[in-house]
Amino acid sequence: MHKIERLLQTLAPKGVEFRKLGDIGEYKYIRGVTYKKNQEINNLECGIKVLRANNITLSNHLNFEDIKVINKNVKIRKEQYLKKNDILICAGSGSSEHIGKVAFINTDFDYVFGGFMGVIRIREVNSRFVYHIFTSNIFKQYLEKSLNTTTINNLNANILQNFLIPIPPLEIQQEIVKILDQFSILTTDLLAGIPAEIKARKKQYEYYREKLLAFKPLTPHKEVKKC
Protein backbone atom coordinates (compact mmCIF):
# COMPACT_ATOMS: atom_id res chain seq x y z
CA MET A 1 0.00 0.00 0.00
CA HIS A 2 2.83 2.38 0.89
CA LYS A 3 4.40 1.83 -2.54
CA ILE A 4 1.09 2.67 -4.26
CA GLU A 5 0.79 5.85 -2.19
CA ARG A 6 4.36 6.87 -3.12
CA LEU A 7 3.70 6.19 -6.79
CA LEU A 8 0.49 8.24 -6.69
CA GLN A 9 2.32 11.15 -5.04
CA THR A 10 5.07 10.97 -7.66
CA LEU A 11 3.16 10.09 -10.84
CA ALA A 12 -0.34 11.46 -10.16
CA PRO A 13 -0.06 14.16 -7.47
CA LYS A 14 -3.13 16.04 -8.77
CA GLY A 15 -5.32 12.93 -9.01
CA VAL A 16 -6.19 10.30 -11.60
CA GLU A 17 -7.94 10.76 -14.93
CA PHE A 18 -11.31 9.01 -15.40
CA ARG A 19 -12.42 8.08 -18.91
CA LYS A 20 -15.31 6.25 -20.51
CA LEU A 21 -14.34 2.76 -21.60
CA GLY A 22 -15.40 3.55 -25.17
CA ASP A 23 -13.02 6.54 -25.30
CA ILE A 24 -9.95 4.46 -24.53
CA GLY A 25 -7.74 3.71 -27.53
CA GLU A 26 -8.03 0.28 -29.16
CA TYR A 27 -11.11 -0.67 -27.14
CA LYS A 28 -13.35 -3.31 -28.73
CA TYR A 29 -16.50 -5.01 -27.50
CA ILE A 30 -17.32 -8.21 -29.37
CA ARG A 31 -20.53 -10.22 -28.98
CA GLY A 32 -20.48 -13.99 -29.17
CA VAL A 33 -21.43 -16.72 -31.63
CA THR A 34 -25.09 -17.51 -32.25
CA TYR A 35 -26.05 -21.04 -33.25
CA LYS A 36 -29.06 -23.37 -33.37
CA LYS A 37 -29.74 -26.33 -31.10
CA ASN A 38 -29.35 -28.75 -34.01
CA GLN A 39 -25.82 -27.42 -34.60
CA GLU A 40 -24.63 -28.77 -31.24
CA ILE A 41 -22.65 -32.04 -31.20
CA ASN A 42 -21.35 -34.33 -28.45
CA ASN A 43 -17.79 -34.87 -29.67
CA LEU A 44 -15.28 -32.47 -28.05
CA GLU A 45 -12.60 -33.36 -30.59
CA CYS A 46 -14.66 -32.83 -33.76
CA GLY A 47 -16.25 -29.46 -33.14
CA ILE A 48 -15.73 -25.97 -31.76
CA LYS A 49 -15.94 -25.49 -28.00
CA VAL A 50 -18.20 -22.70 -26.72
CA LEU A 51 -18.05 -20.92 -23.36
CA ARG A 52 -21.38 -19.69 -21.98
CA ALA A 53 -22.64 -17.84 -18.90
CA ASN A 54 -22.51 -20.99 -16.73
CA ASN A 55 -18.78 -21.26 -17.49
CA ILE A 56 -18.07 -18.16 -15.39
CA THR A 57 -18.50 -18.58 -11.64
CA LEU A 58 -20.03 -15.93 -9.39
CA SER A 59 -16.50 -15.39 -8.06
CA ASN A 60 -15.36 -14.44 -11.61
CA HIS A 61 -13.32 -17.48 -12.57
CA LEU A 62 -13.60 -19.85 -15.54
CA ASN A 63 -15.34 -23.17 -15.04
CA PHE A 64 -14.82 -25.77 -17.78
CA GLU A 65 -17.70 -28.04 -16.78
CA ASP A 66 -20.63 -28.47 -19.18
CA ILE A 67 -18.90 -27.17 -22.31
CA LYS A 68 -21.05 -26.98 -25.43
CA VAL A 69 -19.58 -28.09 -28.76
CA ILE A 70 -20.87 -26.92 -32.12
CA ASN A 71 -20.37 -27.99 -35.73
CA LYS A 72 -17.43 -26.50 -37.61
CA ASN A 73 -19.84 -25.26 -40.28
CA VAL A 74 -21.26 -22.63 -37.89
CA LYS A 75 -20.27 -19.17 -39.13
CA ILE A 76 -17.62 -17.78 -36.77
CA ARG A 77 -15.62 -14.60 -37.16
CA LYS A 78 -11.91 -14.72 -36.37
CA GLU A 79 -12.35 -12.14 -33.60
CA GLN A 80 -14.81 -14.47 -31.82
CA TYR A 81 -12.02 -16.85 -30.81
CA LEU A 82 -10.75 -16.09 -27.32
CA LYS A 83 -7.38 -14.40 -27.11
CA LYS A 84 -4.86 -13.77 -24.36
CA ASN A 85 -5.82 -10.78 -22.16
CA ASP A 86 -9.49 -10.87 -23.20
CA ILE A 87 -12.10 -10.08 -20.54
CA LEU A 88 -15.01 -12.47 -21.06
CA ILE A 89 -18.29 -11.07 -19.73
CA CYS A 90 -21.83 -12.38 -19.30
CA ALA A 91 -23.93 -9.91 -21.30
CA GLY A 92 -27.37 -11.52 -21.24
CA SER A 93 -29.20 -13.79 -18.81
CA GLY A 94 -32.59 -14.53 -17.34
CA SER A 95 -31.06 -13.84 -13.93
CA SER A 96 -29.74 -10.36 -13.11
CA GLU A 97 -27.11 -11.75 -10.71
CA HIS A 98 -25.28 -13.35 -13.64
CA ILE A 99 -25.12 -10.18 -15.74
CA GLY A 100 -21.65 -8.65 -15.58
CA LYS A 101 -19.82 -11.78 -14.39
CA VAL A 102 -16.32 -11.70 -15.85
CA ALA A 103 -13.38 -14.04 -16.37
CA PHE A 104 -9.86 -13.20 -17.49
CA ILE A 105 -8.36 -15.14 -20.39
CA ASN A 106 -4.70 -15.92 -19.72
CA THR A 107 -3.81 -17.42 -23.09
CA ASP A 108 -4.97 -17.82 -26.70
CA PHE A 109 -7.04 -20.98 -27.05
CA ASP A 110 -9.47 -22.63 -29.44
CA TYR A 111 -12.69 -21.67 -27.70
CA VAL A 112 -15.35 -19.25 -28.82
CA PHE A 113 -18.05 -17.65 -26.66
CA GLY A 114 -21.82 -17.85 -26.98
CA GLY A 115 -24.33 -15.23 -28.09
CA PHE A 116 -25.21 -14.14 -24.56
CA MET A 117 -21.55 -13.42 -23.88
CA GLY A 118 -19.20 -10.64 -24.89
CA VAL A 119 -15.47 -9.96 -24.90
CA ILE A 120 -13.76 -6.72 -23.98
CA ARG A 121 -10.47 -6.31 -25.83
CA ILE A 122 -8.33 -3.37 -24.75
CA ARG A 123 -4.67 -2.43 -25.18
CA GLU A 124 -4.02 1.11 -23.99
CA VAL A 125 -4.81 0.13 -20.39
CA ASN A 126 -3.57 -2.98 -18.54
CA SER A 127 -6.41 -5.43 -19.25
CA ARG A 128 -5.86 -7.28 -15.97
CA PHE A 129 -6.32 -3.94 -14.15
CA VAL A 130 -9.60 -3.44 -16.04
CA TYR A 131 -10.65 -6.99 -15.09
CA HIS A 132 -10.24 -6.16 -11.38
CA ILE A 133 -12.36 -3.02 -11.89
CA PHE A 134 -15.08 -5.19 -13.43
CA THR A 135 -15.11 -7.43 -10.33
CA SER A 136 -15.41 -4.42 -8.02
CA ASN A 137 -18.32 -2.52 -6.50
CA ILE A 138 -17.55 0.33 -8.92
CA PHE A 139 -18.87 -1.76 -11.81
CA LYS A 140 -21.62 -3.49 -9.80
CA GLN A 141 -23.12 -0.14 -8.77
CA TYR A 142 -22.87 1.23 -12.32
CA LEU A 143 -24.54 -1.91 -13.66
CA GLU A 144 -27.41 -1.79 -11.16
CA LYS A 145 -28.09 1.82 -12.09
CA SER A 146 -27.84 1.17 -15.85
CA LEU A 147 -30.00 -1.96 -15.87
CA ASN A 148 -32.70 -0.29 -13.78
CA THR A 149 -33.58 1.78 -16.85
CA THR A 150 -34.63 -1.35 -18.76
CA THR A 151 -36.70 -4.45 -18.04
CA ILE A 152 -34.32 -6.61 -20.07
CA ASN A 153 -31.19 -8.11 -18.51
CA ASN A 154 -28.91 -7.19 -21.38
CA LEU A 155 -25.50 -5.60 -21.12
CA ASN A 156 -25.30 -3.81 -24.45
CA ALA A 157 -22.41 -1.99 -26.09
CA ASN A 158 -23.75 1.42 -25.10
CA ILE A 159 -23.81 0.57 -21.38
CA LEU A 160 -20.25 -0.73 -21.49
CA GLN A 161 -18.71 2.08 -23.52
CA ASN A 162 -20.16 4.68 -21.12
CA PHE A 163 -18.66 3.03 -18.04
CA LEU A 164 -16.29 5.53 -16.42
CA ILE A 165 -13.06 3.99 -15.15
CA PRO A 166 -9.93 5.39 -13.47
CA ILE A 167 -6.78 5.45 -15.63
CA PRO A 168 -3.76 5.80 -13.32
CA PRO A 169 -0.26 5.69 -14.85
CA LEU A 170 0.71 2.24 -16.17
CA GLU A 171 3.23 1.63 -13.38
CA ILE A 172 0.47 2.08 -10.80
CA GLN A 173 -1.87 -0.20 -12.76
CA GLN A 174 0.79 -2.91 -12.77
CA GLU A 175 1.47 -2.60 -9.05
CA ILE A 176 -2.25 -2.83 -8.21
CA VAL A 177 -2.61 -5.91 -10.42
CA LYS A 178 0.36 -7.51 -8.68
CA ILE A 179 -1.17 -6.98 -5.22
CA LEU A 180 -4.71 -8.05 -6.14
CA ASP A 181 -3.51 -11.11 -8.06
CA GLN A 182 -1.64 -12.29 -4.97
CA PHE A 183 -4.84 -12.12 -2.91
CA SER A 184 -6.80 -13.77 -5.73
CA ILE A 185 -4.32 -16.68 -5.93
CA LEU A 186 -4.50 -17.18 -2.16
CA THR A 187 -8.29 -17.34 -2.34
CA THR A 188 -8.21 -19.83 -5.23
CA ASP A 189 -5.63 -22.03 -3.47
CA LEU A 190 -7.91 -22.25 -0.44
CA LEU A 191 -11.02 -23.36 -2.34
CA ALA A 192 -10.66 -26.91 -1.06
CA GLY A 193 -9.92 -25.71 2.48
CA ILE A 194 -11.86 -24.59 5.54
CA PRO A 195 -14.95 -22.51 4.61
CA ALA A 196 -14.27 -19.91 7.33
CA GLU A 197 -10.72 -19.37 6.03
CA ILE A 198 -11.93 -19.11 2.43
CA LYS A 199 -14.49 -16.50 3.48
CA ALA A 200 -11.87 -14.49 5.41
CA ARG A 201 -9.44 -14.48 2.46
CA LYS A 202 -12.19 -13.46 0.06
CA LYS A 203 -13.18 -10.55 2.32
CA GLN A 204 -9.52 -9.52 2.54
CA TYR A 205 -9.23 -9.51 -1.27
CA GLU A 206 -12.45 -7.50 -1.62
CA TYR A 207 -11.33 -4.98 1.00
CA TYR A 208 -8.00 -4.28 -0.71
CA ARG A 209 -9.59 -4.27 -4.16
CA GLU A 210 -12.05 -1.52 -3.21
CA LYS A 211 -9.34 0.43 -1.37
CA LEU A 212 -6.80 0.21 -4.20
CA LEU A 213 -9.31 1.18 -6.88
CA ALA A 214 -10.65 4.24 -5.03
CA PHE A 215 -8.80 7.07 -6.79
CA LYS A 216 -9.06 10.80 -6.34
CA PRO A 217 -10.33 12.22 -9.67
CA LEU A 218 -8.05 14.59 -11.52
CA THR A 219 -9.18 18.15 -10.91
CA PRO A 220 -9.06 20.23 -14.11
CA HIS A 221 -6.78 23.23 -13.84
CA LYS A 222 -8.75 26.46 -13.66
CA GLU A 223 -7.21 29.72 -14.81
CA VAL A 224 -7.34 32.52 -12.29
CA LYS A 225 -8.90 35.60 -13.84
CA LYS A 226 -6.78 38.69 -13.58
CA CYS A 227 -8.34 41.90 -12.34
Question: In which residue ranges do the predicted regions lie?
Answer:
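Charged, alpha-helix-forming regions
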Residues: 1-227
